[in-house]
């Protein structure tokens, strides 16, 4: 079934194949991707769209000596298969297995780690100029999708690259949404090869020299050339940055891709400066179900390729994302000032229904987190109530805007932080581990940490009622299964509650780890406090609990350093209270991909781990004796 693919263990093997066999290899590669993802889950549509492009790039360029940088990186399964990792695809996105994204420590062919968008051009330009500085003859290639081109960082890199006339940089725009280009055909293929050819480049260069003596003629020539290209391709914007624009061409046509890339490689060798190749691909290419619904097959779980995705017959728990989506629609019905904003994450953030029902109040700003935050600030200035739905890890990209444009002006923006805490198979790049530390230090900022689905809905309402910025952080997937109450009830701002009365030890839980804390407390005989807010901290409740207990434990699904536990320590110190304090949370390390439950256990944040950590630090005691004295083994 994979007779050709099984002979390819590196791009060097690929480059030894006759060109006539590449189409058959691409077909096998596509089938292998479908088979692999069906068994492990993962990104599918985007990978099916890059099969031929991946084959062509590795065939033409001398990787890994030539640097190949993939933007975002979820479309690199064909790249992984061709670079010696075919046999490990069964471990994809599993604990100890292959990452779903490029990793420098995984392969020398993964020249730059990616998972967040729009970084590839900057990285590839840095590599190209470093090679030039060191006197090394190598090329750098950045592959970036049309969605990623909406981020300002991509254009900052283009702007910088354009001033380096001789750098060996190629930017490949993988246009898989047809959002930029018109349909392509034979004329476009011919023009692309012509524009990347030696005669065209030479004639263009010589013509400019000749016309230097007659500036008006030079300007006329520029206009004529631009007009001729403009009839077929959107060249002007990229050439204005100093790139030689080529395309668009069919990204699934190897007979077009390979000669065009060979021509570009020659141009780079002759010092022609940065090159820009526009290819048009189709998400889900070659698998009809994914072609018909590329969004559904963007990141599927395991499935039968012959049947496609099947709806589960068992009723699923409501996810936090769904809780948010329903609250958003209900609050929009209640308050006409509400506007919803997303940076290109409509489905992932649960805003599909809101978009359908309130299209004029829905704003997808594209992959542009910095803009999204300040855009929300501008709306808040005019009396609207913006709700920005964004993954915790992506809000990091708009941090200056969060401080300067929102918090400094104390504007009432609600940040619905999805994917807070561990995210499972997507791993360290997508984990929402740092939002409490990076938000807690900002004046005027509130941070709510709901323990379950019902609290999530209520705390979203509380956040919306404030006249200051508030973030509500909640994890991926389902929680404890607490059904949200109807209506738009709120909870007191900055106030927690005692959920279990015990003695000796008090566990202060922030967020969904309340439930494993309650389980551990049954065996420890401990008090459990549902703190709800990392900021403002309920210091009144904290000091009351501290006065009645011998030791305190904080618990959060976030970084310990600077997190909610640190806030508790600071509050105790400010009040002059000295208590043994154990802070439990995510360790000072990047946490790899795997199942969330397994990762939490490895971090010691399941019920057994919490109990073990408390006993290790403070000694043993019996839950059946509420008056048992806590024996301290060590006190910081």
Swiss-Prot record:
* Family annotation (Pfam families): DXP_synthase_N, Transket_pyr, Transketolase_C
Q: Which PROSITE patterns match?
A: TRANSKETOLASE_1 (PS00801), TRANSKETOLASE_2 (PS00802)
InterPro entries the record matches = Dxylulose-5-P_synthase, THDP-binding, Transketo_C/PFOR_II, Transketolase-like_Pyr-bd, Transketolase_BS, Transketolase_C, Transketolase_CS
> What class does this enzyme belong to in the EC scheme?
transferase
Gene3D superfamilies in the record: 3.40.50.920, 3.40.50.970
Which parts of the sequence bind Mg(2+)? 146, 176
Key word Signal present in the record?
A: no
Q: Which GO terms describe its cellular component?
A: cytosol
Enumerate the cofactors the protein uses. Mg(2+); thiamine diphosphate
Which reactions does this protein catalyse? D-glyceraldehyde 3-phosphate + pyruvate + H(+) = 1-deoxy-D-xylulose 5-phosphate + CO2
Q: What does this protein do?
A: Catalyzes the acyloin condensation reaction between C atoms 2 and 3 of pyruvate and glyceraldehyde 3-phosphate to yield 1-deoxy-D-xylulose-5-phosphate (DXP).
Q: Which family does it belong to?
A: Belongs to the transketolase family. DXPS subfamily.
- This protein is called 1-deoxy-D-xylulose-5-phosphate synthase
């Amino acid at each position: 079934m994979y007779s050709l693919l099984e002979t390819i263990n590196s791009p060097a093997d690929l480059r030894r194949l006759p060109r006539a066999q590449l189409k058959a290899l691409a077909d096998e590669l596509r089938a292998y991707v479908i088979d692999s993802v069906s068994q492990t889950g993962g990104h599918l549509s985007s990978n099916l769209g890059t099969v031929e492009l991946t084959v062509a790039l590795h065939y033409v360029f001398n990787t890994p000596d030539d640097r190949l940088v993939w933007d975002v990186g979820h479309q690199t399964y064909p790249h992984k298969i061709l670079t010696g990792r075919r046999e490990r695809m069964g471990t994809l996105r599993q604990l100890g297995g292959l990452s779903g994204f490029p990793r420098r420590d995984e392969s020398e062919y993964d020249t730059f780690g990616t998972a967040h968008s729009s970084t590839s051009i900057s990285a590839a330009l840095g590599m190209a100029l470093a090679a030039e500085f060191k006197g090394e003859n190598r090329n750098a290639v950045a592959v970036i999708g049309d969605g990623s081109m909406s981020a300002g960082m991509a254009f900052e890199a283009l702007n910088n690259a354009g001033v380096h006339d001789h750098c060996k940089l190629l930017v490949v725009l993988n246009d898989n949404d047809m959002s930029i280009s018109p349909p392509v055909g034979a004329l476009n293929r011919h023009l692309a090869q012509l524009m990347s050819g030696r005669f065209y480049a030479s004639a263009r260069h010589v013509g400019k020299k000749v016309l230097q003596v007659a500036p008006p003629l030079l300007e006329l020539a520029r206009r004529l050339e631009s007009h001729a290209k403009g009839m077929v391709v959107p060249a002007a914007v990229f050439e204005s940055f100093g790139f030689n624009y080529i395309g668009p061409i069919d990204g699934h046509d190897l007979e077009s891709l390979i000669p065009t890339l060979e021509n570009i490689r020659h141009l780079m060798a002759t010092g022609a400066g940065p090159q820009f190749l526009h290819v048009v691909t189709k998400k889900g290419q070659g698998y009809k179900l994914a072609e018909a619904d590329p969004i559904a097959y963007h990141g599927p779980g395991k499935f039968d390729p012959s049947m496609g995705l099947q709806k589960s017959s068992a009723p699923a728990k409501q996810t936090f994302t769904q809780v948010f989506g329903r609250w958003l629609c209900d609050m929009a019905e209640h308050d006409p000032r509400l506007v919803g904003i997303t940076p290109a994450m409509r489905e992932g953030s649960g805003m599909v229904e809101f978009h359908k029902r309130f299209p004029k109040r829905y704003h997808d700003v594209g992959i542009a987190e910095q803009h999204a935050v300040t855009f929300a600030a501008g709306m808040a200035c005019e009396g609207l109530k913006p709700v920005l739905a964004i993954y915790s890890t992506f809000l990091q990209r708009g941090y200056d805007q969060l401080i300067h444009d929102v918090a400094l002006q104390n504007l009432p923006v609600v940040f619905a932080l999805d994917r807070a805490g561990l995210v499972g198979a997507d791993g360290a790049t997508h984990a929402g581990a740092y939002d409490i530390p990076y938000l807690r230090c900002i004046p005027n900022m509130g941070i709510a940490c709901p323990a379950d689905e019902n609290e999530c809905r209520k705390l979203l309402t509380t956040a919306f009622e404030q006249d200051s910025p508030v973030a509500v952080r909640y994890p991926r997937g389902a929680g404890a299964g607490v059904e949200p109450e109807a209506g738009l009830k709120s909870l007191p701002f900055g106030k927690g509650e005692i959920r279990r009365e015990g003695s000796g030890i008090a566990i202060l839980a922030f967020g969904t780890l309340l439930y494993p804390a309650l389980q551990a407390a049954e065996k420890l005989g401990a008090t459990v406090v549902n703190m709800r807010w990392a900021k403002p901290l309920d210091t009144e409740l904290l000091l009351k609990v501290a006065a009645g207990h011998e030791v305190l434990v904080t618990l959060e699904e976030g970084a310990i350093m600077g997190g909610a536990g640190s806030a508790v320590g600071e509050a105790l110190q400010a009040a002059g209270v000295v208590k043994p304090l154990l802070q439990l949370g995510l360790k000072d390390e990047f946490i790899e991909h795997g199942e969330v439950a397994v990762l939490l256990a490895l971090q010691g944040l399941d019920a057994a781990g919490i109990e073990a950590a408390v006993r290790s630090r403070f000694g043993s005691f019996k839950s059946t004796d509420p008056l048992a004295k806590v024996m301290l083994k060590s006190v910081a």
